[in-house]
């Protein structure tokens, strides 16, 4: 095997260990905060996308209290969160293509699509009620030293336990379909090679497109260009290491495996050091209300991600791999977050705004 082939097999095709990847994500998230002034987060931007869609029907969501709080000016191409998420999706797609890991995959049961939609809505609603998901109210929220993130983390773990119990109900269990895979494994080696070669070329094309997109944003703003590059890094890391906080939380209650949870804690510990340094140098931390919204939102988020089968990072990279189920989960996330914006005047005044 040539040096180039060995490099490709080791670093582009094989999945990476999640532990060092999570540490790298912790380091990168701290630098992202220091450079852009905001934390690595996604559900706020997804809610803005919902606001844009609502505006197509003649409504004025920019006048709603929630969008005055999180902002709705411009387009996803003009906002730090927007271009970062586009970078994440491109980075995950590029990594999956280079690994020959992209194919259109439908769930074995249509019931799973409905389950993904409902779970996505619950998770999106809980995330925006708590002002953050497994990123902004957990992985990057705790390093901000915001008390609400600690409450959200504990509530999410409890919600994941409830979600596991719900998924074990007989009417939610999907029957296994067993079949022979011998022909697909051994019958068309040459076809598999051609497919891998095509996907590698497509991955390179996506990488070129991503670099061009970053250059376009750099032409407007240094911060926007850097946000694209960080998004590419985030997306590539989560796809190669298959980072999913849902799996980590679910495994605590089903198999007792803790390796992913340890990796998340270590990544947050590293991020705490970097984030503290950025704050000491003058960056403003993102602090949110420590109210019932953080606890209720965490419980709902924990239930939702287990029912849906993936958290924010999990569904994003799986969607780029061609898993249709997670396209539906993403749509559910946008719907759930937007529902919080619709009802924020009632929710916020009772669950969030009166609290420190």
Located regions from the model:
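Membrane-interfacial helix-loop segments of redox and metal-homeostasis proteins
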Residues: 1-356
């Amino acid at each position: 095997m040539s040096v180039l082939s060995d490099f490709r097999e080791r670093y582009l095709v094989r999945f990476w260990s999640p532990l060092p990847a999570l540490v790298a994500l912790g380091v990168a998230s701290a630098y992202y905060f220091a450079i852009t002034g905001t934390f690595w987060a996604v559900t706020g931007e997804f809610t803005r996308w919902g606001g844009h869609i609502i505006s197509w029907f003649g409504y004025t969501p920019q006048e709603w209290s929630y969008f005055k709080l999180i902002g709705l000016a411009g387009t996803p191409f003009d906002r730090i969160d927007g271009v970062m998420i586009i970078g994440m999706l491109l980075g995950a797609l590029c990594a999956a293509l280079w690994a020959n890991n992209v194919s259109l995959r439908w769930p074995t049961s249509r019931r799973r699509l409905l389950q993904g939609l409902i779970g996505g809505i619950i998770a999106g609603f809980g995330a925006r009620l708590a002002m953050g998901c497994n990123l902004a109210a957990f992985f990057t929220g705790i390093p901000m030293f915001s008390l609400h993130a600690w409450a959200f983390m504990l509530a999410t773990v409890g919600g994941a336990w409830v979600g596991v119990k719900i998924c074990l109900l007989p009417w939610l269990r999907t029957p296994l379909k067993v079949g022979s895979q011998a022909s697909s494994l051994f019958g068309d080696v040459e076809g598999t090679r051609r497919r891998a070669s095509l996907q590698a070329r497509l991955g390179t094309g996506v990488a070129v497109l991503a670099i061009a997109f970053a250059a376009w944003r750099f032409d407007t703003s240094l911060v926007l260009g850097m946000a694209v590059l960080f998004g590419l890094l985030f997306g590539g890391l989560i796809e190669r290491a298959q980072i999913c906080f849902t799996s980590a939380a679910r495994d605590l209650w089903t198999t007792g495996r803790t390796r992913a949870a340890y990796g998340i804690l270590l990544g947050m510990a590293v991020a705490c050091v970097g984030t503290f340094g950025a704050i000491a140098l003058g960056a403003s931390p993102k602090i949110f209300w420590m109210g019932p919204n953080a606890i209720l939102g965490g419980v709902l988020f924990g239930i939702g991600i287990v029912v849906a089968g993936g958290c924010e990072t999990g569904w994003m990279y799986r969607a780029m791999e061609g898993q249709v189920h997670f396209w539906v989960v993403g749509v559910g996330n946008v719907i759930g977050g937007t529902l919080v914006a619709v009802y924020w005047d009632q929710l916020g005044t009772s669950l969030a705004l009166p609290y420190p």
